[in-house]
Amino acid sequence: MANEGHRPDRLTLWQRSTLRRMRKASRKREGEPLTSEDWSTYYRLMSSRSSRFWMGLLRSLPSSPRCGICGAPFAGFGSRLVKPLGYRPSRKNPTLCDTCIEASPPGGMTTEVGVLFADLRGFTRLSEQSDPEAVSALLRRFYACAERVLFPEAIIDKLIGDEVMALYLPMYGKLEDPATTMLEQSRELLARVGYGSAEGPFVEVGIGLDYGEAFVGNVGERSLYDFTAIGDVVNVASRLQGEAKGGEIVASGGLVERLMAPVGERVEVSLKGKAAPVLAYRVS
């Protein structure tokens, strides 16, 4: 359990070093509130060469699922190696590990972020008509496809029943062209599910994409952190996903304008909570 300051009781040497360097750079004592500038420093250090090397080692270990940030395995042989170091699923956010969720200070910063929502179509009907174990196996298969395609460029923020939410954060230094990466990975995810194959998809999936500014960081009290993004860009991506048919990607105009050339069919869609129609592109 973390103490009342901003430094948890148990961190890896790498994370202790990152926090120490961040506080030195921002001239902040332990326990002092952090500003957006401090968070910017923290993320820059988290994406340093040494940090990327360490995360590369974690990702090379076998077994899935993994932490959505650092890639530490949560199952199999790989998890037995890293669990003593604190790399186990966090009770606050089980898609992230204890060390990542505890290492980040409370609060966050406003920054650019890409948001992806992928949702299973007809899941309620499928749940009513199928055996619960079969439904669970289908969900695990879908989650595994999402993890293989989206990681490590994206942080898998949430697995919400029949839905995946992923964040693309340029501030982590992994993405040179986040809009292109988001579109390419969305297409690859649909291909992994089976669209375009002779057998067809094993489940119907629709995807919504948006890109813009949002508040990103640890939201909530220390006893119940949730590393996530909050803002209109999240709401729009979620609503666009609701507009997507099975096998279709609906991307916002804000994301498509960052691409080298427009893609798909230009449309205007009416979204809940929006006074005016929103420009979007349907990509099949």
What does each model-found stretch correspond to?
Residues 7-8, 15-20, 228, 248-257:
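Flexible, glycine/charge-rich interdomain/linker segments that couple
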Residues 2-68:
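A broadly conserved sequence feature marking short terminus-proximal activation segments
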Residues 206, 210, 216-241:
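Catalytic-core segments of nucleotide cyclases and related cyclic-nucleotide turnover enzymes
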Residues 48-160:
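Juxtacatalytic helix/coil linker segments
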Residues 103, 189-192, 196, 222, ...:
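Conserved, well-folded catalytic cores of nucleic-acid-processing
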Residues 131-137, 159-203, 209, 229-232, ...:
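Short helix/loop segment flanking the catalytic signature motif in cyclic-nucleotide metabolism enzymes
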Residues 177, 225-228, 249, 261:
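Catalytic cores and conserved motifs of cyclic dinucleotide signaling enzymes
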